[in-house]
């Protein structure tokens, strides 16, 4: 193979680039454009975390931009519109289709409705002009409904200084109404406002878990204009199942059964659970209280006795399969240090007791009828067959393939972004705050390097789905449950104890020291520095652990260097947190933390226009307004400018 010098490579690269910029005027125009963009204010970043399948609450937070939409409406119209008019306009922007139906039903004549159309279109155009004031025209155009771009741009940039175009603008709007396009235009304008108030979305983990509609969240994210994802422990569990880990698959099926969410598997992703049910009905009883499904807070109709019976049996069957599948992984990976989790081998089947961590406990609600006490890891032939069928169904689900591929494409274990570190779980440390080490494939890693190696193996496992018991696939499961995992953040997962031991002391899961050390500003500064970030300016933005505001816990920790934004989208946590989640806004002026009250139904917002969700707290204000130049995107643009200037000097100025 012919060696190519750096000089030759540079020439070939510039030759290719010059094909796009074949005149100095074209090149100069692009440089001028990019240099100018660097001077614009940075766009608004929106941080959300721990969605846990709660689609209704999540989509509402997206629609209102964590209160940003109402703030913009107030900025412009507070002195000009009544409270009711402000509320109606807010509800219209949030839920345009639904609000339009309600408003139109109030009018007695077409004339009255047409006057409302004209006024509303004017208000929405004014709102878009305000929301887009820090964007280029090109970027704004991409946010507008394609079919109405020409009309909207004419109204946005109208100049009527000499009255020459007054009737032109009036005719534009009147024709929209006359040709029955007003509803669609208003709907398009409302969604444009939603898009413009947030430039970029960060999802700091756990799209999946016990909530009923993670698939709808994934569809929404796939269609979102700009975002990134930091994987959560539940997200990696689903990725692992799709990538070929049967133990990850058993875990997520068990969680779905426990929280009465098996319809995610069957209805949302089209996976047939009939073979699992057949197995469960053959071996398990319906009256085991430890395995009855939890009542779903969002589900109004109760399960029938038959449905509850089937789920209880499935729950036992898949839990036993999970405990069996864990054994060979723990044995072939001694570096995982999980010998205490060989739970089925630690059971005394004669006395119905177990000894774990030096303590012996009596067992309750047991269902060991498929366990071979001489070889507890052994699957029954029908258990093996069921898992093979389920794994094949998972990997052949087109919708699941689309969702998992998107998670891999947009996701990572952590992300340095605009000077901040975004991470779902933790950075594993010891009691002294030193990065904990973990051995993988004969090498020892810690801190950022450990997270990079974990991520490498997640991607390798995903790319090699046919391998189901290789190191990479085992490490995906370890991320779910291992003590040095940055996603789990605890010393052991006590699933077995929670089902079968009455003594709640055995259920306790000890957290990594990170979770109390993150209160220390010096510790957070050290972590930021270890990840190559400016400790004076940067922050860690964290999810994973619900903030118990009801007990006085503060999501702003370490003098504002650590922000924890899991306040409980999940309805199951809201009684312990006291709220329904935190989100974070970061615009060119600084950061605001937003606490959300429980989202009950959009009907109240539609009828009253009152959005009680958003209570803002200023985290800080920038001393100097941040520009695009100061962001990740700015660095990328500057790199492009440097190359274009190199081309200019090479081809046109020398």
From Swiss-Prot:
Keyword Glycoprotein: no
Catalytic reaction(s) noted: beta-D-fructose 1,6-bisphosphate + H2O = beta-D-fructose 6-phosphate + phosphate
SUPFAM superfamilies reported in the protein's UniProt record: Metallo-dependent phosphatases
Gene Ontology biological-process annotations: gluconeogenesis
InterPro entries per the UniProt record, alphabetical: FBPtase_class3 (IPR009164), Metallo-depent_PP-like (IPR029052)
Domain of life: Bacteria
Keywords: Carbohydrate metabolism, Hydrolase, Manganese
Enzyme Commission code: 3.1.3.11
Pathway: Carbohydrate biosynthesis; gluconeogenesis
Region (Disordered): 288-307
Record carries keyword NADP: no
Gene3D superfamilies with a match to the protein in the record: 3.60.21.10
Positions with biased composition (Basic and acidic residues): 298-307
Pfam families on file: FBPase_2
Cofactor(s) needed for function: Mn(2+)
Gene Ontology MF annotations: fructose 1,6-bisphosphate 1-phosphatase activity
Family: Belongs to the FBPase class 3 family.
Record's protein name: Fructose-1,6-bisphosphatase class 3
């Amino acid at each position: 193979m012919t060696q190519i010098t750096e000089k030759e490579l540079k020439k070939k690269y510039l030759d290719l680039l010059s094909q796009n910029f074949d005149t100095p005027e074209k090149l100069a125009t692009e440089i001028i454009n990019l240099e100018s963009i660097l001077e614009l204010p940075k766009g608004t970043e929106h941080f959300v975390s721990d969605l846990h399948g709660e689609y209704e609450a999540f989509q509402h937070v997206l629609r209102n931009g964590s209160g940003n939409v109402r703030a913009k409406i107030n900025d412009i119209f507070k002195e000009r519109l009544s409270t009711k008019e402000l509320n109606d306009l807010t509800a219209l922007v949030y839920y345009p289709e639904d609000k339009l139906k309600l408003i139109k039903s109030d009018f007695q004549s077409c004339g009255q409705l047409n006057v409302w159309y004209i006024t509303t279109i004017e208000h929405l155009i004014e709102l878009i002009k305000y929301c887009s004031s820090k964007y280029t025209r090109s970027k704004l155009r991409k946010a507008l409904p394609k079919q109405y771009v020409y009309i909207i741009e004419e109204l946005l940039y109208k100049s009527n200084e000499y009255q020459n175009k007054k009737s032109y603008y009036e005719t534009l709007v009147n024709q929209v109404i006359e040709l029955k396009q007003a509803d669609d235009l208003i709907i398009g304008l409302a969604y444009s406002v939603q898009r413009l108030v947030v430039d970029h979305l960060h999802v700091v983990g756990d799209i999946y878990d016990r909530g009923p509609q993670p698939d709808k969240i994934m569809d929404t994210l796939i269609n979102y204009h700009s975002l990134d994802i930091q994987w959560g422990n539940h997200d990696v569990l689903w990725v692992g199942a799709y990538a070929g880990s049967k133990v990850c698959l058993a875990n997520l099926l068990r969680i779905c059964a426990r929280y009465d969410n098996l319809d995610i598997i069957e209805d949302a992703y089209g996976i047939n659970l009939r073979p699992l049910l057949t197995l469960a009905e053959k071996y398990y009883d319906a009256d085991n209280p430890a395995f009855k499904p939890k009542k779903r807070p969002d589900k109004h109709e109760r399960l029938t006795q038959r449905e509850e019976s089937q789920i209880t049996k499935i729950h036992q069957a898949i839990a036993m399969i999970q405990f069996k599948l864990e054994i060979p992984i723990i044995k072939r990976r001694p570096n995982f240090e999980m010998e205490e989790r060989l739970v089925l081998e630690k059971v005394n089947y004669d006395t119905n007791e177990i000894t774990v961590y030096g303590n012996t406990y009596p067992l309750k609600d047991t269902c060991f009828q498929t366990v071979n006490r001489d070889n507890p890891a052994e699957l029954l032939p029908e258990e093996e067959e069921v898992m093979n069928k389920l794994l094949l169904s998972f990997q052949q689900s087109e919708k699941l393939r689309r969702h998992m591929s998107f998670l891999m494409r947009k996701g990572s274990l952590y992300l340095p972004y605009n000077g901040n570190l975004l991470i779902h779980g933790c950075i594993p440390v010891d009691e002294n705050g030193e990065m904990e080490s973990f051995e993988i494939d004969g090498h020892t890693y810690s801190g950022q390097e450990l997270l990079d190696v974990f991520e490498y193996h997640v991607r390798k496992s995903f790319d090699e789905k046919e391998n189901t018991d290789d190191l990479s696939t085992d490490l995906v499961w370890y991320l779910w449950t291992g003590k040095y995992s940055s996603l789990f953040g605890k010393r052991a997962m006590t699933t077995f104890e929670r089902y079968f031991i009455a003594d709640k002391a055995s259920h306790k899961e000890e957290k990594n020291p990170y979770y109390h050390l993150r209160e220390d500003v010096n510790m957070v500064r050290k972590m930021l520095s270890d990840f190559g970030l400016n400790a004076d300016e940067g922050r860690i933005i964290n999810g994973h652990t619900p903030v118990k505001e009801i007990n006085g816990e503060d999501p702003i920790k370490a003098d504002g260097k650590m922000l924890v934004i899991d306040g409980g989208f999940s309805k199951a946590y809201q009684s312990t947190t006291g709220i329904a989640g935190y989100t974070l806004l970061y615009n060119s002026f600084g950061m605001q933390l937003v606490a959300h009250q429980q989202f009950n139904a959009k009907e109240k917002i539609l009828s009253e226009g009152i959005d009680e969700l958003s209570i803002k707290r200023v985290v800080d204000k920038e001393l100097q307004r941040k520009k695009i130049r100061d962001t990740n995107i700015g660095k990328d643009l500057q790199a492009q400018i440097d190359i274009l200037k190199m081309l200019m000097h090479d081809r046109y100025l020398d």
